[in-house]
Each structure stands twice: as structure tokens, then as C-alpha cells.
Amino acid sequence: MKKTKIVATMSDFRCTEEFVKQLFDAGMDVVRVNSAHVSEDGATHIVETVHRVNPAIPIMIDTKGPEIRVTTIADEYGNSINFRPGDRVAVRGSDGSDFTTRKVVYMNVPSIVSDIPVGARMLIADGELEIRVVGKNDTELDCEFVVGGAMRSRKSVNVPGVSIDLPSVTEKDRRFIEWAVKNDVDFIAHSFVRSARDIRAVQDILDAHGSNIKIISKIENQEGLDNIDEIIEASYGIMVTRGDLGVELPAEVIPNTQRRIVEKCICAKRPVIIATQMLYSMVKSPRPTRAEVSDVASAIYERVDAVMLSDETAMGDFPVQSVETMARIAREIERDETHFKPMIDMDMVSVNHEITAQLARSAVRASTNLPIKYVVLDTKTGRTGRYLAAFRGRKTVMAVCYQLHAQRILALSYGVVPILRNQELSDRYHFLVDALEFLDQYRKLDDGDLMAIVGGSFGPDGGASYVEIANVQNIRKRNEEIVAQHNC
């Protein structure tokens, strides 16, 4: 079983039960839905189809997020306006109702003129066009094209190093978040997160509806990087989306930026996902480039929780092969035990005074020093499983969950295989039998096989309180004795 998880983006036009099953069998762990490219009806179709195939498959939905865009091009210009380097234009703010012309480029942020200083760079359409602000007055920016090209309607705008007054949650985002609450979604991946304030705005909506959906913060701009520590602290997990990030930052700094974010997430015991163009050539080709294989491998060597496919599975010609390729790369890289050393003796993972974190580290240390086959735990919220994942042990973690939501969210965590127990404990050891039965389906367990057990003496609500090492024979014998006592 691979330890690195795979997030696959799903589009409604190709989401059939057979297609979902093929991706799941190929190695997909989490389904992603991008609200920027799907309607609420389309998203509902995806969720219902996925959960008909397997209710345990988690769903992640991306918000569109606060972003700057050029308004619609005026009809007289057709689909685009061509600009050359040196051309001058005025840039003005708008509520979106004004049309862009050759003389005036409108952007969908009313405060754009006051927010952007003279000297700033504005990158349009992921950097295909670039303009520089050479002057301004109260109503408009005087701009000159540095890089020309065809400007089309609704293209994105990035302003590196400048903080723009954008709302934390757009009206469309709010509608989709409320939709997610009603439709059994597990993760909200919030786009263009700039600070903890943006996360709190999403959390306030979730709290108002009594939802336990987890927030994944997408790091896509310099402001998000500047506030990365507070964002990690406020989030359930982090997604490093290298597309927009690569527009704002020089390409050569992206690898170190990615590595630094991954290390911070592992330290904070937060799941981390690497995204954008990981196997992009497989949109049209049945095989990846060598550079793409190395990119995926590098992320896995960095010990990320998950790697993500976007266009490859949403619209590409080889979606199943893309997932299979990513899964093969993960399994091959994870065989390198000289590199994949557990993080039990490093200062990388924060333990502090948390009992669960101390127990998780002890269990991973035991599984490293003893011939233990699996680490087994039970969990109500998923926290114990997430903490065990942070120490990146070599042994698979079997997490027996008492709630479907806990099973789903743990599907995103490194090295964790979550299974569902339909009833809470009648005895503190009974969850081990469920784990053994599940493992027996994949591999015959010998009586002498050792297990590291992380459990609680005070029921699922009491949290983890002990680590125990036991062999399969003694676990089964103890369960037989407990069953016999209950039948008396």
C-alpha cells in the first residue's frame, strides 16, 4: 500500500460510477471539485456519484476565492485586444459592469487605483501580459505595457508584492460553502488565502451551520507566504498551488518555497498537498515526461501527505493512466528506506505537552525498533491518526474510526488507512478485531506478528492514553475472553 495520497480533480461531464471506480482502483484517495468550473448542480452530481461508488471517498471542493480579473472585452474588439510593448492604457476599478477597451482596462476591484502604487507590476493571464504603473491620479492608473499580447475577457491579474483590498469570501464562495455543508463535503480548499483572517471568514460560515468541514488553505501569492505561520495554525491543512504562486515568484525560488512550506506543515502536524501540473503532459500523452516524474518524486521525497492531479483527470485524455502513474511513482520512491526515516528523533514535528503527540511518537519509535507489522489505533475525530501521520513512520497506520467523517478526512493523511466501525466500543480492545479482520483481507497475519496499539482507556471521547505492543495471537485470545464474558 502506498503511503502518499492522491487527490484527483473530477469534472461533472465525465463523472460516471464506472469512471470513479476506475480512478479509485488506480489509487485515487480524494476527489476534488473546482467550483470555478462547475455549477452547483454539476457538483451535486459528482458528490452523489462518488458516494454511490464508495461512501468513504472524501470530497474536497475549491472555492474560487478573491481574485482580480479584467472585465469583459467590449464587443467592437471581438474576442481580444492586441497590445504591444510600450502601449499606454489607463486602468480603472469597476464593479464588473464596465467594458474593457483599447484605451481603458477595467478590473473588477473598485479600490484598485488606491491600492496599487506607482512602480508596481501587473501580470495578466498568468503573466502572458505585463504592465507597469508609471503614474496615477484619483480615478485611474497610467500604465505601460512591458510584455504585449492578446488580452481576453475575464483574465486573471496578479500584482506581486502589493496587498489589495479584496473580500475574504466572495458571494459565489459563500453559496458554494453553504452548498458544501448540505451535500456531505469533507474539505473546503479556500483559494488565495492571504492571512488567518481569510480562514476565519470561511470558518464563521461553517460554524453558523454547525459544520465540521475541514479547511485547506491554498497558498498562491506572496501575501500568503508572508503570513504562512498564522495560516498553518488556523488551517486543517495546506495546498501549495504552484501555478499562481509561480506567477508572483521567480520560478527558481518555487522549489525551496515548496520545501519550506512542507516542513512547516509536518512540524505543525497539518496535512500538506502539492498541486499544479504534476503530470501535465498526460493531458494529451499516455506517458509523462522524465521531468514530471522527477517532480512527483521530489514531492514524495519531501514527505508530503498528498500529490494532486488537476487537468490530467478533469479533462485529460488519459485520466486513469495518470492516477496509475502517480501511484507507481509513490510506491517506488517509498521503497527507499535509506531516505524514508521516521521523524521520531528529529525536532521537525512539534510535540510540546500534547499527550496524543507523545504517544504517537512512542508508537512510531516502537515500530522502528521492533519488527512491528502495523500501528493500530481507534479515533473519533481523526486527530490521533493525523498525529501518527506527522511522524512519517515506515509502517502503515490502521485507523479504526467511529464516524464516517473521521474516516474520510484521514484518507488525506500520509500512511493512514482508515476503516469504519459502525458502533462504539463495548470494550477498549474490541476495535483491534476490526483492524485484524480488515488486514486479513489483504495479507494473512501470523499469530506472532506484532502490532503497536494506540488507544484510550476511557472510551472514544477520552482520547488516547496508552501505547501497547502485542502479537496477533494474544489480541485474538483476549477478544475471545471478552466475548465469552459478555455472553455469560
Task: Give the positions of each predicted feature.
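Non-catalytic helical/linker scaffolds that mediate oligomerization, partner binding
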Residues: 1-488
